[in-house]
């Protein structure tokens, strides 16, 4: 057994790379309008260190990339692949971690 693997950390705590990309499924999109095949949207994340772990939606505008955070939006998160900050779409995810 590898001694480096004795402490198992939940996957959510592995969000330590600002280039990680997440698949976001908004619950209102998945359940609204009676649609059974709502496709998840993929957003890169922006990682912020120094505060409690949280996840929220944010929209890009002309003033700030962090404007209009939607912290109350229920979402389902799945890590997918790496992305660069240049690939940020109009909507992205802001992650804060201790």
From Swiss-Prot:
Annotated InterPro entries: Protein_9b_Betacoronavirus, Protein_9b_SARS
Give the membrane topology, semicolon-separated if more than one.
Answer: Peripheral membrane protein
Biological process annotations from GO: negative regulation of defense response to virus; negative regulation of mitochondrial fission; positive regulation of autophagosome assembly; symbiont-mediated suppression of host cytoplasmic pattern recognition receptor signaling pathway via inhibition of MAVS activity; symbiont-mediated suppression of host type I interferon-mediated signaling pathway
Show where the 9b domain sits.
9-98
Q: Name one GO molecular function term.
A: identical protein binding
One GO cellular component assignment for this chain's record is: outer mitochondrial membrane protein complex
Q: Where in the cell is it found?
A: Virion; Host cytoplasmic vesicle membrane; Host cytoplasm; Host endoplasmic reticulum
Q: Which Pfam families match?
A: bCoV_lipid_BD
Assembly, per entry: Homodimer. Interacts with host XPO1; this interaction mediates protein ORF9b export out of the nucleus. Interacts with host MAVS. Interacts with protein ORF6.
The similarity comment for this entry is: Belongs to the coronavirus group 2 protein 9b family.
Q: What is this protein called?
A: ORF9b protein
* Source organism (scientific name): Severe acute respiratory syndrome coronavirus (SARS-CoV)
């Amino acid at each position: 057994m590898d001694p480096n693997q004795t402490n198992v950390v939940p996957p959510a705590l592995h969000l330590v790379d600002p280039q990680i990309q997440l698949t976001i499924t908004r619950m209102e999109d998945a359940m609204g309008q009676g649609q059974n095949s709502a496709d998840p949207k993929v957003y890169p994340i922006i990682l912020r260190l120094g505060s409690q772990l949280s996840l929220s939606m944010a929209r890009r505008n002309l003033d700030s990339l962090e404007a209009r955070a939607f912290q109350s939006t229920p979402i389902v998160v799945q890590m997918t692949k790496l992305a660069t900050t240049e690939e940020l779409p109009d909507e992205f995810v802001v992650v804060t971690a201790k």
